Amino acid sequence: MGIRSSRIIFFDRASRGRDPPATFLNHMSKLKILIDQFQEIHPRWIFIIPSAFLLALFMLPIFALLVRSINADFFNYALSEQAFQALRLSLITSTITMGCGVIFGTPLAYILARWRFRFKSWIELLIDLPIVLPPSVAGLALLIAFGRRGLFGSVLYLFGISLPFTTAAVVLAQIFVAAPLYVRSARIGFTEIDEQLEEAAHVEGANQWQLFYEVMFPLAGRALLSGAILTWTRALGEFGATILFAGNLEGVTQTMPMAIYLGFERNLGIALTLSVVLVVVSVFLLMLTKRLEKREQD
């Protein structure tokens, strides 16, 4: 009797900590009623609250950066030789990267959009891979491939060509991580063009070059422009792959992100000033992009 009574007491205590199914359903129905009432009274707040949280997450760090960077030495840092060299190198290498992406990426994007061949999906996967790779992995891969003792770099070194820790290495690292953005955007732009337009151009006697230059290129212009600007901005902010493959040599491989990293270790004021300069350049570029897109739509 003692064991049986203890079991009854145990199960009775355990059952007290649990709500019966009817009580649980009652709580859920009350919660649903509250949600419905909240939606009826303030239906927009369901969208405003999470949106405001995310916008605050975007705005507050930039605001804090601007506030902390404003001091008496701001213009001295912004007009310093280090800032000028880093900005000039960033603009030059990013522009070269964008040009290489357009020149070599446009034909590749057109092939992927219009041609049908084996292993096409694998090639698309290979092109998109640098977009999702961690920058450190990209830099290490470039160093293993094109370093002096790398798989292909050792062969280049026999001909007197050494890529690591040069300006060419900066451009190569930027192309590796940024050019896939252009190829992806251009491929989507070419894919969205109606194939009947190509057939009509063929009927009118247009050759392959005329078809591409006079039909495909103008119709995909918005996607090509968007991809080019994405490539430029991604190259401008490239850090991880560049520091592993090209290093951080002032005037040679020290782009703006490199100078910010070095300034963070030595002088926070320089890092803050260079960060603001990069933010201003990025904002100007985004405004230019919006204006070009608006003209294209008009």
Which residues fall in each region the model found?
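Transmembrane alpha-helices
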Residues: I49-F53, L129, F176-F190, D194, ...
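Periplasmic/extracellular loop-to-transmembrane helix junction in inner-membrane transport proteins
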Residues: L31-W45, A64-G99, I111-K120, L262-L268
